[in-house]
Amino acid sequence: MKNLYTQLEQDNVPKTLTLLLQSIVGACTEIATRINHGALSDVLGSLPDHNVQGEVQKKLDVIANNILIESLKKNKQVRAVASEEVEDIILCNSFGKYLICFDPLDGSSNTDVNGSLGTIFSITSASAAQTEVSEEDFFSTGRSIIAAGYVLYGPSLMLALSTGSGTHIYTLDPSNNNFMLTHPNLNIPEDTNEFSFNLSNQFKWPENVQKYIVDLQLGTDGIRKKNFNMRWLGAMVGDMHRILCKGGIFGYPEEKNFKYGKLRLLYEANPIAFLVEQANGLASNGTTSILDTVPSSIHQRIPVFIGSKNEVLLIEKYALGK
């Protein structure tokens, strides 16, 4: 069984990018240790502050964010980073080759109940010109991503990663602290009978999305002619991990009070879309590919429908009223 770095070498990943991934993976391993200690080290619960998104911050949100930033600042290949938890970009090394976007702790509302958690990240190339980086340098589409992944803090510590040559899943071997390739070349089934939507928000969604949900709940007697199962873990990483492995569709539509959806384009939607499309799936905002969206803010939000190809294409038809 190959380890992470053997696979990266086989995929001809540049040494500089490998070293950057090593920094990210190392930081996530440290985050996993802090999560595992949980209540034993008083890292659960909320803080009195809100983050830039207006959301209540969990203690582990801040801990995970600080661990990642500290690790990335030490890496000379990093020009700048953008974090979901921080209002502005963070400048690192003026000669660095890479820009990194990350959500340090996806699903942090699950921290107090020992639920699914994850870290999501993507990497793009910085401008070759040695100029000061600004927020606008992060405004490239997801097609410019050169590597993306997530770490799932579950029963096993798992890394899903793509450097543009397919999507692979690695599992941490605690006996030697190496990530081993356990699920190579993922291939999401084109059809599915599983969906991951938070139906408690259904009344807030556009009518066409509501109709899609109603139709798939009618079972074998309805227009879809089959039964669907619902899965919802309260963490995008957890739901998407299942979809990468077994197929399905994840949806977080726009809502009445959130015209552009709630998930962030740079920190959540783009990295997951990159992984999914590298695994034969699709990722859409309801009408067009997420990866073709040009950002206008580092904290831009976007509606998300990601997963099995035929199901994503179908929901686009519903969005068009077909």
Swiss-Prot record:
GO CC, any one term: cytosol
EC number(s) reported in the record: 3.1.3.11
Binding annotation for Mg(2+) 1: 84, 103, 105
Names of required cofactors: Mg(2+)
Pathway given in the UniProt record: Carbohydrate biosynthesis; gluconeogenesis
Details of cofactor binding: Binds 2 magnesium ions per subunit.
EC top class named in words: hydrolase
Compartments, record wording: Cytoplasm
PROSITE patterns, per the entry: FBPASE
Cross-referenced Pfam families: FBPase, FBPase_C
Broad class of where this protein is predominantly found: cytoplasm
List of residues binding substrate: 106-109, 198, 262
Binding site for Mg(2+) 2: 103, 106, 268
Any one GO MF annotation of this record: fructose 1,6-bisphosphate 1-phosphatase activity
Catalytic activity entry: beta-D-fructose 1,6-bisphosphate + H2O = beta-D-fructose 6-phosphate + phosphate
Protein keywords: Carbohydrate metabolism, Cytoplasm, Hydrolase, Magnesium, Metal-binding
Keyword Secreted included in the entry's annotation: no
GO biological process: fructose 1,6-bisphosphate metabolic process; fructose 6-phosphate metabolic process; fructose metabolic process; gluconeogenesis; sucrose biosynthetic process
Classification via HAMAP family: FBPase_class1
PANTHER family reported for this sequence: FRUCTOSE-1,6-BISPHOSPHATASE-RELATED (PTHR11556), SEDOHEPTULOSE-1,7-BISPHOSPHATASE, CHLOROPLASTIC (PTHR11556:SF35)
Family according to the record: Belongs to the FBPase class 1 family.
Subunit details: Homotetramer.
Protein name in the entry: Fructose-1,6-bisphosphatase class 1 3
